[in-house]
Amino acid sequence: MLALSKEVLGLTNIWYEPALHHASTLTLPEGPSIRVISAPYFLATKMEAFRGRGKMDFQASHDLEDFVAVIEGRENIVNEIAESPRDVRDYLAQAAKGLLAESRFLDVLPGFVLDDERVPIIEKRLAVIAGGAK
């Protein structure tokens, strides 16, 4: 659930509205339909939350953990981001560039994955995403 107005949950995120604007509709097996945001917009909401409410706490941020899980778990995430609108693509490129330049992130990254062998995969995906940074 995304709250577009701060009054609803006491917080909001600059990426919620664009995420919903670009969301797709999914009909559930029992009939109701829901709106589903794309992985790139989900990543943008998570990075914004990490930077805002998460106060860039590299060790304890669930938002950063979610961000890393999506980068690790979606094989096509680099292509999904490349095919996204420029605003979200640029935001994620800057975010990836910033993470790779941050020693605190590189230090905690192995703690976000079950297998240390996945760390280079995540770093490589972030480097490709960061390659689009302006």
Which residues are covered by each model-predicted region?
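Compositionally biased terminal segments of proteins
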Residues: M1-K134
